[in-house]
């Protein structure tokens, strides 16, 4: 019924589980766990409704149906072997973490899950997310499989002191790019903080850009809590040069094991580095050292700077979006300006001409999706929602990391 992660493959258990299985078989540090195979989802959906009904009714076709008793029993046995320790329940769709599209952040993953009832509910949430609006919109934009299946990964939870994302090099002499912050990884991958950014050269050189990390995410029992980072730690590097090189070295091994440049989520807990997931890099990053802006601003124009997240330029009316209630105001060609983006906002990326956020790094989920869709993005622009203003004419240069507000 369940497959140990050491035996998981992408064909039977989805992209995320398959990659973790490959890494475990290569002897790399991956938290132990199990996969709920794709066929379990297919069987559960087939028993609950027809495939056409599932596509037509979306999440509602699955959300209220009980998880089959044999699946629940297998999950209960697996959780019992951990002695009550918390787990993380991650999506592992058949179209996820692939070479032609990552579907980054679109499907549900739940941290700090404790007890069989919560695990079962989290597995169902993964299944439901396969048919949620953001995932459907992404598949349409990328012309992906219209009828994918959902595997699920259940792993031991890692209480990270430091975590982040790493892009391994595409060639032997290329650099490794690392974003890192305090606490659990969602702060970085969801763009909720401005992370430290590290570039580790093939020769071991380390270039570090330290950000102000105001908050961190931690586990408290079976809940996640956001805490304020103490003032002395906000501008302190979360990785020293030795840690950055250690991650880069591990990243090169991951790339060799999986074949090609990888987008790796990692964590450090009590000095131990863990690989939480890995997937192919699906679109090139802008250069670590941005070029000069491609458009010279007019006299008197306001120029803001941030991290270049996705190449290209776009000009259009700024549209400030602070929550889903603002979606109705967005028009095709607008420049989305927001505190940060949520995976649930992916449908907007099919409409807007560019993206500007106040927080987030170039390795966050929003930046990955913007690069895949070819939308210019500049991230981590302080007070962008206040300084740009709704309906002002702005130009986004996602290669140079600049946002220019026109005069007037």
Segment roles from a protein language model:
Residues 175-176, 206, 273, 403:
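Hydrophobic "anchor" residues
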Residues 180-261:
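Conserved catalytic alpha/beta cores of large enzymes that bind or transform nucleotide phosphates
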């Amino acid at each position: 019924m369940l497959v140990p992660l050491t035996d998981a493959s992408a064909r039977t258990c989805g992209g995320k589980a398959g990659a973790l299985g490959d890494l475990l078989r290569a002897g790399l540090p991956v938290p132990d766990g199990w996969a709920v195979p794709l066929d379990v989802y297919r069987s559960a959906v087939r028993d609950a409704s027809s495939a056409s009904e599932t596509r037509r009714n979306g999440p509602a076709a699955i959300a209220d149906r009980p998880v089959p008793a044999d699946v629940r029993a297998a999950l209960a046995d697996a959780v019992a072997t951990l002695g009550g320790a918390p787990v993380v329940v991650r999506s592992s769709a058949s179209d996820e973490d692939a070479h032609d599209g990552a579907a980054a952040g679109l499907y549900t993953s739940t941290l700090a899950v404790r007890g069989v009832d919560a695990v079962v509910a989290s597995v169902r949430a993964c299944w439901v997310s396969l048919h949620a609006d953001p995932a459907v919109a992404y598949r349409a934009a990328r012309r992906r499989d219209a009828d994918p299946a959902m595997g699920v990964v259940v792993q031991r939870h890692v209480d990270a002191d430091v975590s982040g994302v790493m892009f391994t090099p595409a060639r032997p002499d290329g650099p490794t790019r690392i974003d890192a912050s305090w606490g659990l990884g969602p702060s970085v991958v969801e763009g909720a903080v401005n992370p430290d950014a590290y570039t580790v050269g093939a020769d071991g050189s380390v270039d570090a850009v330290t950000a102000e990390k105001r908050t961190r995410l931690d586990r408290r029992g079976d809940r996640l809590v956001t805490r304020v980072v103490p003032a002395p730690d906000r501008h302190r590097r979360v990785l020293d040069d030795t840690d950055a090189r250690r991650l880069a070295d591990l990243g090169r091994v991951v790339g060799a094991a999986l074949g090609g440049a990888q987008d790796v989520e990692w964590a450090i807990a009590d000095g131990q580095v863990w690989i939480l997931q890995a997937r192919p890099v699906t679109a090139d990053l802008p250069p670590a050292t941005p070029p000069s802006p491609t458009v010279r601003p007019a006299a008197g124009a306001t120029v803001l700077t941030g991290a270049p997240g996705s190449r290209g330029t776009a000009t259009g009316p700024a549209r400030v979006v602070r929550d889903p209630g603002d979606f109705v105001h967005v028009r095709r060609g607008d420049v989305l300006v927001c505190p940060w983006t949520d995976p649930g906002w992916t449908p907007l990326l099919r409409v807007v001409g560019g993206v500007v956020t106040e927080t987030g790094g170039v390795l966050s989920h929003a930046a990955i999706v913007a690069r895949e869709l070819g939308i210019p993005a500049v991230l981590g622009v302080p007070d962008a929602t206040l300084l740009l203003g709704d309906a002002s004419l702005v130009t986004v240069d996602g290669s140079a990391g600049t946002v220019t507000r026109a005069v007037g």
